[in-house]
């Protein structure tokens, strides 16, 4: 995503412009929200809307009311069913999770995941939930590499094995 500045014009990508003009039926003078994916949320006015071209003029930067002072990073082993992994990525983006890492374990049935597809799902969820920060999708790595490279202060592992359930305490 480009860096956005107030009082400048920005052209939406062909795909985004077509969606904005044809599907949402937006026209010149309509106001839209733009994000840079890094926490910036901007109000803009459409100044040109023709078929596959949409130009927006940024009017002002909006306050990020969802900003927090911590980072949430979730790792998961992709399931056999790709749709479940995509669903997880979508929900993570809607909840505002900062980063999702995929890992391969000794029980993994799927070791090849198209992160480009998950990134598209995340962008769609970002737009639908009016979030300003994009959820980063990291490529699949083995479990040991993931754990050894984790820089978070607190790390937790959740599992569905057995009937015993432990609760996180403060």
Task: Name each region found by the language model.
Residues 1-63:
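N-terminal positively charged helical leader segments and presequences
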Residues 1-2, 64-66, 147-148, 169-170:
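Short secondary-structure boundary/capping segments
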Residues 4-5, 141-147, 163-166:
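A short acidic, often aromatic-flanked loop/helix-cap motif at beta-alpha or helix-coil junctions
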Residues 36, 104, 159-162:
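Short secondary-structure boundary segments
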Residues 42, 110, 166:
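Glycine/Thr-rich phosphate-binding loops of Rossmann-like dinucleotide-binding domains
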Residues 48, 60, 78-80, 162:
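Non-catalytic surface loops within mature trypsin-like serine protease
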Residues 65-157:
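RNA substrate-binding interface of SAM-dependent RNA methyltransferases
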Residues 155-170:
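Active-site/ligand-binding-proximal alpha/beta "capping" segment
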């Amino acid at each position: 995503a480009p860096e956005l500045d107030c009082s400048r014009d920005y052209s939406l990508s062909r795909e985004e412009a077509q969606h904005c003009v044809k599907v949402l039926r937006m026209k010149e003078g309509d106001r839209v929200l733009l994000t840079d994916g890094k926490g910036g949320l901007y109000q803009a006015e459409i100044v040109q809307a023709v078929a596959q071209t949409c130009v927006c003029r940024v009017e002002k930067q909006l306050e990020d009311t969802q900003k927090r002072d911590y980072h949430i990073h979730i790792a998961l082993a992709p399931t056999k069913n790709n749709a479940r992994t995509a669903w997880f990525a979508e929900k993570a983006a809607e909840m505002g999770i900062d980063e999702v890492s995929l890992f391969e374990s000794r029980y993994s049935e799927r070791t090849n995941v198209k992160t480009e597809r998950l990134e598209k799902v995340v962008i769609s969820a970002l737009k639908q939930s009016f979030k300003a920060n994009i959820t980063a999708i990291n490529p699949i790595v083995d479990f040991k590499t993931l754990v050894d490279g984790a820089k978070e202060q607190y790390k937790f592992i959740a599992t569905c094995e057995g009937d015993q359930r432990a609760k996180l305490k403060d």
